């Protein structure tokens, strides 16, 4: 079983039963939030067969059979930006194993902490659809449900506005100074002249 800060989230009742039947050696599941969406990473480790299988969003990325060395690592890529991910397999005692996930060379926990400083995320419902809007603060790229949006920047009296459209809805992210050095710039999503609360991660 997995342990540590980067331990997986185990299968819940919402997952289809057929995927559990198919994945008989499923040992770890992680949900990873990237700019283009939340990706589910599943790992099968057959400690008697030597099998290792990595699935990203239900699609098989890596399959290795008859691996005689049961510890090691598997490296693959996740999401539209091809973010590097590595699953580390370590023996902790006897036939017990620990599975940890690294994203861009950092533990999942450290990566998510860093990401919360470099991105803002909003979730809202528009026209009966759930939308996930992500602002990458370092590049000012805006993503909506996995698509990088066409944007137009505009300077205004109290800061900047980054405009984009979702369907027939006018949206913009307003950036204003907090006036406090430690807080920095405050980003606010406005959709149809309505402020959307930020998702806290």
Curated annotation (Swiss-Prot):
The entry's keywords: Apoptosis, Cytoplasm
Location of this chain's protein in the cell: Cytoplasm
Any Gene Ontology biological process: negative regulation of extrinsic apoptotic signaling pathway via death domain receptors
Any GO CC annotation of this UniProt entry: cytoplasm
Chief localization: cytoplasm
One Pfam match: FAIM1
Annotated function: Plays a role as an inducible effector molecule that mediates Fas resistance produced by surface Ig engagement in B cells.
Protein name listed in UniProt: Fas apoptotic inhibitory molecule 1
Organism per entry: Rattus norvegicus
């Amino acid at each position: 079983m997995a342990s540590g800060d980067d331990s997986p989230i185990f299968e819940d009742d919402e997952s289809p039963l057929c995927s559990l039947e198919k994945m008989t050696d499923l040992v770890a599941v992680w949900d990873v939030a990237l700019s283009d969406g939340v990706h589910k990473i599943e790992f099968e480790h057959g400690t008697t067969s030597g099998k290792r299988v990595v699935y990203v969003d239900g699609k098989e990325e890596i399959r290795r059979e008859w691996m005689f060395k049961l510890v090691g690592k598997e490296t693959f890529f996740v999401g539209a930006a091809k973010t590097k991910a590595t699953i580390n397999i370590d023996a902790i005692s006897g036939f017990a194993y620990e599975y940890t996930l690294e994203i861009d060379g950092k533990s999942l926990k450290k990566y998510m902490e860093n990401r919360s400083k470099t991105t803002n995320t909003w979730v809202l419902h528009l026209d009966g659809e759930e939308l996930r809007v992500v602002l990458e603060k370092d590049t000012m790229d805006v993503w909506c449900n996995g698509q990088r949006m066409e944007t137009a920047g505009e300077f205004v009296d109290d800061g900047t506005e980054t405009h984009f459209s979702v369907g027939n809805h006018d949206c913009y992210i307003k950036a204003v100074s907090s006036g406090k050095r430690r807080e920095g710039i405050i980003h606010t999503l406005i959709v149809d002249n309505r402020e959307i609360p930020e998702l806290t991660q």
